[in-house]
Swiss-Prot record:
Function: Essential for the replication of viral ssDNA. The closed circular ssDNA genome is first converted to a superhelical dsDNA. Rep binds a specific region at the genome origin of replication. It introduces an endonucleolytic nick within the conserved sequence 5'-TAATATTAC-3' in the intergenic region of the genome present in all geminiviruses, thereby initiating the rolling circle replication (RCR). Following cleavage, binds covalently to the 5'-phosphate of DNA as a tyrosyl ester. The cleavage gives rise to a free 3'-OH that serves as a primer for the cellular DNA polymerase.
Lineage, top ranks: Viruses, Monodnaviria, Shotokuvirae, Cressdnaviricota, Repensiviricetes
Cofactor field: Mg(2+); Mn(2+)
Family named by the database record: Belongs to the geminiviridae Rep protein family.
Protein name as catalogued: Replication-associated protein
Annotated motif Nuclear localization signal, positions: 291-301
Cofactor note: Divalent metal cations, possibly Mg(2+) or Mn(2+).
Taxonomic source organism: Miscanthus streak virus (isolate 91)
Amino acid sequence: MRAPASSAASNRPGPSNHPTPRWNSKQFFLTYPHCNLTPSELMKELFSRLTEKIPGYIKVSQEFHKDGDPHLHVLIQLNTKLCTRNPKFFDVQGFHPNIQPVRDAEKVFGYISKTNGDSDEMGELQLRIKKPEKPTRDQRMAMIIASSTNRNEYLSMVRKEFPFDWAIRLQQFEYSAAALFTEPPPVYQSPFPNEQIVCPPELVDIIDQEWNQQPNGPRRPRSIYICGPSRTGKTTWARNIGRHNYYNSTVDFTHYDKDAIYNVIDDVPFKFLPQWKALVGAQRDYIVNPKYGKKKKIPGGIPSIILTNDDEDWIKDMKPAQVEYLHANAHVHYMYEGQKFYVLPAEE
């Protein structure tokens, strides 16, 4: 019967599971603890050993700990890679260093330059030229905002820098362009000379006494509500008074002109105007939600001229309390038969 294998044999240590480190680098950071060599002595030894690898730069710095024990720190830069598995390759006169490949020579150089002992060096230090960091998306957008001078240039730069975003978010970029580069509204050009435009005396009195005498005063000026037939010149008259916000068929506050002195609301059905009280009552600092835009505060404080035809008379669609508010905050004028806001030369 065969004897069992010796337990001692089974417990023998096998080959090491930790292979010898393999060094493969052009730059090394060495630290020789408890080393009483001078920096010059160590540098000469290392230079002699590394001649085949063409050393480009070697710096040795001496550091004394509080107990007076000397350490030597070394930065080595080679022109060709050193590839070795020999753990004693950098051993000098029985002194064995801690070995680390170097990625950032500038940091190592800064560290060993702050030691409190002697130092020696040879060659020329080579620092890696850092590539400039690419600007972030926010930084690129900030550059576009800062450098563009008008709406078209802004949109063109966005299209070039962010083509995909431009394709799917053009509406938002157009909104931001309008906010960045506010263009004054075009001056209204009347189709009639001023001398051919006429206005009922009571409306002239409201404009002269309430609109012109106390602009931005403590009292809110009354608006003007005009209901009458089409093609009678009421829009031309209303738009010829001065700088204004003009709304036709719908009210969109996206391009609200803060310098306007009144609003013209032309052929906008009452049911489609949720902010009618703010506009008719010349209210200040009200909040609106423009189409495709964020909520915004309207400074307001200016009156409105509301123009409607007989078939869309607001009063027909109002509740009694709403009619009362309209009369309290606006002069209501129904055009009589044959009335016009202009006169042709032949009719004078």
